[in-house]
């Protein structure tokens, strides 16, 4: 029975993933046609490669329709409810680093922690006649961090369809939860990260579907990739 490994379909994530695999002894033979999203691995007839977007890889791992995949931990934990029951992180690959953070306008000088934000949220409705609005693409992680971890309940998530960091300046939100690598885009939009506002430090990971976790072949592939990372 073959094993399906889903890889990012484009960009630096794809390039770096292919390099990690080659270091582990898995040379991916790319198709001649860029529209062909399947590939093979030299000398590994039972290992199928499938190229997908990083978000689709997270979904398919959750469904169990692929055995292994490379995607960001942020996408795994945002896309899948009860992620740890559905997938296992086999290895952190050392690239694609980014943090999911809570950021507020720099002019909120007295707001530096989540406790400060709790105070702001509590009286925001009284002052403004509405709940604190948070623009984000990460609604699951936001709810878990605000409601479950910090007990903040009085807020409203505004779905972000464009550049999340521009939402406060545009007036569509009061603050944001977004992903950042260097913080430069946040600073350019006059936003600051709260001192304890890092929700998740994410990076590209090798992830297995729990359905496939007992497969000896899946574990062998994961072990070889882990060993390659140590070279």
Curated annotation (Swiss-Prot):
Superkingdom of the organism of origin: Bacteria
Subcellular localization, as worded in the UniProt entry: Cytoplasm
Pathway given in the UniProt record: Amino-acid biosynthesis; L-histidine biosynthesis; L-histidine from 5-phospho-alpha-D-ribose 1-diphosphate: step 1/9
Free-text note on domains in this protein's UniProt record: Lacks the C-terminal regulatory region which is replaced by HisZ.
Function: Catalyzes the condensation of ATP and 5-phosphoribose 1-diphosphate to form N'-(5'-phosphoribosyl)-ATP (PR-ATP). Has a crucial role in the pathway because the rate of histidine biosynthesis seems to be controlled primarily by regulation of HisG enzymatic activity.
Record organism: Brucella melitensis biotype 2 (strain ATCC 23457)
Name recorded for this polypeptide: ATP phosphoribosyltransferase
Catalytic activity: 1-(5-phospho-beta-D-ribosyl)-ATP + diphosphate = 5-phospho-alpha-D-ribose 1-diphosphate + ATP
Family annotation (Pfam families): HisG (PF01634)
PROSITE patterns xref list: ATP_P_PHORIBOSYLTR
Keywords annotated in UniProt: Amino-acid biosynthesis, ATP-binding, Cytoplasm, Glycosyltransferase, Histidine biosynthesis, Nucleotide-binding, Transferase
Gene (UniProt): hisG
The EC number(s) this enzyme carries: 2.4.2.17
Quaternary context: Heteromultimer composed of HisG and HisZ subunits.
Family statement drawn from the similarity comment of this UniProt entry: Belongs to the ATP phosphoribosyltransferase family. Short subfamily.
A GO-annotated cellular component: cytoplasm
Database matches in SUPFAM superfamilies: Periplasmic binding protein-like II
């Amino acid at each position: 029975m073959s094993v399906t490994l889903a890889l990012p379909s484009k960009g630096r994530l794809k390039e770096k993933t292919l390099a990690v695999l080659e270091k582990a002894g898995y040379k991916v033979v790319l198709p001649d046609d860029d529209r062909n999203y399947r590939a093979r691995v030299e000398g590994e007839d039972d290992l199928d490669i499938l190229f997908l977007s990083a978000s689709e890889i997270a979904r398919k791992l959750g469904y169990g329709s692929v055995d292994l995949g490379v995607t960001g931990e942020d996408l795994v934990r945002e896309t899948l409810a009860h992620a740890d029951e559905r997938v296992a992180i086999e290895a952190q690959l050392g690239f694609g680093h980014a943090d999911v953070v809570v950021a507020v306008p720099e002019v909120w000088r007295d707001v530096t922690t989540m406790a400060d934000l709790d105070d702001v949220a509590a009286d925001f409705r009284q002052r403004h006649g509405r709940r604190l609005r948070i623009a984000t693409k990460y609604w699951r992680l936001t709810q878990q961090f605000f409601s479950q971890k910090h007990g903040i309940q009085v807020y409203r998530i505004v779905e972000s369809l464009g550049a999340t960091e521009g939402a406060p300046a545009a007036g569509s939100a009061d603050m944001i939860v977004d992903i950042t690598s260097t913080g430069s885009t946040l600073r350019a939009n006059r936003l600051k990260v709260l001192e304890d506002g890092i929700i998740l430090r994410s990076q590209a990971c090798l992830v297995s579907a729990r359905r496939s976790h007992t497969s000896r072949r899946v574990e062998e592939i994961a072990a070889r990739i882990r060993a390659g990372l140590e070279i």
